[in-house]
Amino acid sequence: MAQSAKPEIKVVPLETSSSLRTLAYCALKRAITEMDIYGQLEPIRLDERQLSQKLGVSRTPIREALTLLEQEGFVRAVPRRGIYVVRKSKKEICEMIVVWAALEGWAARSAATRATDEEFKALADLFEKFKDEPLSDQMHEYSAANIAFHQTIIKLGRCDLIVEMTQNLFIHIRATQTVSFRQDNRAEQSISEHLAIIGALKARDADLAEKLVREHTLGLASQVEKYGAFAE
């Protein structure tokens, strides 16, 4: 994997209308999930003092927020070294993709009977802009649309527990798409599979929608296993 610029956690000062611990937790969790945590080899260390300065609060709510994030598996404390963002091994990532495939497959099955036609149209609209130009010229935009597509299917399943469970997986799942899209014309194949999934949803074919989503996501696991430069 090519070395890239060291990622920096991006946070903004907090307002004080709610618990500072809760606000710090939400801000840090959002910032971590938006980072490219697999984009460079160096471990990502979080500095309490710097976070305190950036968020405009004391170190106590920062420390409490990091404790909550450690309990959820987003960060880990290393004695005498500090707090680090958690990165998974290739085996763990593949296992997480398998779990995601099962959860998103169920969400697609539910969405086929519970979501509205307008919601399916909005899902299809995510890909309208990619019809006329090569995907190779729009990879950043397509990457964002791909993320939105999978998150939307999860939400259309109308199951809050699945939404919650996939949130903690998503930080690692989203990082794999960069690996996947570089290989075997995967981006072009991906959009074709997305459109087939949307077709099954619009047809209210729950069995087919679940099958296509599961196969599509498990294909990502195969790509990661074959090409992913993650720790073993």
Label the predicted regions.
Residues 117-178, 192-199, 208-219:
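Conserved amphipathic alpha-helical segments that form helical-bundle/coiled-coil interaction surfaces
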Residues 31, 35, 39, 130, ...:
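A short secondary-structure junction motif
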Residues 2-4, 183-232:
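C-terminal regulatory/effector modules of DNA-binding transcriptional regulators
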Residues 89-93, 108-115, 133-137, 157-158, ...:
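A ubiquitous short alpha-helical element
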Residues 20, 95, 99, 115-122, ...:
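A generic short alpha-helical patch detector that favors 3-5-residue windows
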Residues 1-105, 109, 113, 226-232:
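Short linear motifs at protein or domain termini
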